[in-house]
Amino acid sequence: MTQLIHLDGNSLTLEEVIAVARHGAQCELDEQAKEAVVASRKIVDDIVREKRVVYGVTTGFGSLCNVSISPEDTVQLQENLIRTHSSGFGDPLPEDAVRAIMLIRINSLLKGYSGIRLSTVEKLLELLNKGVTPYIPEKGSLGASGDLAPLSHMVLPMLGLGQAYYKGELLSGQEALDQAGIEKIQLAAKEGLALINGTTVLTGIGALATYDGIQLLKLSDIAGALSMEVHNGITSPFEEDLHTIRPQSGQLATARNIRNLLEGSKNTTVATQQRVQDPYTLRCIPQIHGASKDSIAYVKEKVEIEINSVTDNPIITKEGHVISGGNFHGEPMAQPFDFLGIALSEIGNVSERRVERLVNSQLSKLPSFLVKHPGLNSGFMITQYACASLASENKILSHPASVDSIPSCENQEDFVSMGTTAARKAAEILKNSRRIVATEIMAACQALDLKPENHELGKGTKPAYELIRQKLNFIEFDKDIEIFEELNKASAVVESEEFLATIEKAVDLSIQY
């Protein structure tokens, strides 16, 4: 049975965003929220009837805010806004990101501060529930005033304009509506602005990256534990006593995760006079992975505030006051999403260094590049190069977008957040780091099969190894494979919901203690 998400403007969770964006969960509107939307709309209708001067209702936009618009032109004003603000560039956003954007916008409008008609909110919901996904170019937003360009592309199909995906096919907006059995609408006063003035695109993209980042942090612990198995890692750096005296939550959680994953392993060891300490990439897994866990926990908290917030301008209070402010400004999310990118980049960085330890015969005491008869065979040689390339690209992408600004709109909008760029960068860093971590898991399984003694694996590392071996064979000779196909298969296994779910049935994994 399809999950039904109840939207009230106040209680949307990150997990519910994923359910709608990726799994087709249907949504319904809360009755009290509907009443709030209707009450807010009545105030806008009164403003138009009384010919009051209110930004975006009876005036132009941006630096044209001092240009008065007659009541008879207020409808055309809103359509003009959408037609001219839909000026995005680049490839389309993924459909799951667009569905997240639609959902978050609906939830924000349900708080009843935007003056939009209930029927217009219901129309956007109809598109979402029936699987009509607007074509939104990925570039063109400054993250203030909100995400004007991409959100305008979201609105176009509601008017029978633009383009949209329906049942996997890209169609004109009108054709998508026709095939889904949806009637187009005409916008009323304030509605175009209510639909496009907000941080919804950057939040939608960043929300998906945050959720996926949480999964990646668990996968990175699995990868690190498998590398520990290969290197006969010393387990004392993961003892609880060490971490309770520095009670950083992510660090404590990581140490516990590694203990759980390695429980029962016959490959790990203890410190001896001959071998006192392991290198940082093994010994300091709790401190390195844990810092990223704490960062992403902070970002998730910010995301769940933002997806239940009003980021429109102007807003209309319950008492009927109109306030022009700056809730559309993306800075409160731009900085967290920059932080997210840095946290995910570090996971890729340390994983790549562990890949190097696996393929380096001087460090692993295994055949060079994890292949029998190196020389005739190159094995994982260039795989490590590829991981290094992704890790280095991540370092460039980790430069914060939020420290940049560029004035726009005749200097009326003179300091912007670049939050959408921050979110997009974080999503790209995530993809790169996820490939590196999947490669570490694949390489560690290859290394385990090359070890002269095949000891029992840990409670969590054993199912990880078995899941990889169900889809990928041990690589004996270069002539038997095209390694990019093997890498793609490894990524598909590791990124599948089954991989993490199976391991979490065996051991508890968490990102906070």
List the predicted regions and their residue ranges.
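A glycine-/small-polar-enriched, mobile loop at the entrance of the PLP active site in fold-type I
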Residues: Q26-C27, S86-F89, K111
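C-terminal auxiliary extensions adjacent to catalytic cores
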Residues: T2-A25, L29-A36, S40-V48, S70, ...
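FAD-binding glycine-rich core of flavoenzymes that anchor FAD
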Residues: Y113-K139
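Short alpha-helical scaffolding segments that buttress acidic/His motifs in well-ordered protein cores
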Residues: V17, L81, H85, A97, ...
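Conserved, non-catalytic sequence blocks in retroelement Pol enzymes and Pol-derived host proteins
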Residues: Y113, L142-A144, G375
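N-terminal low-complexity or amphipathic/hydrophobic leaders
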Residues: V37-I43, I47-C65
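Alpha/propeptide regions of enzymes that mature by internal proteolysis
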Residues: P92, G115-R117, K218, K302
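FAD-binding core of FAD-dependent oxidoreductases
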Residues: Y55-I69, D73-L77, T84-N107, P137-L159, ...
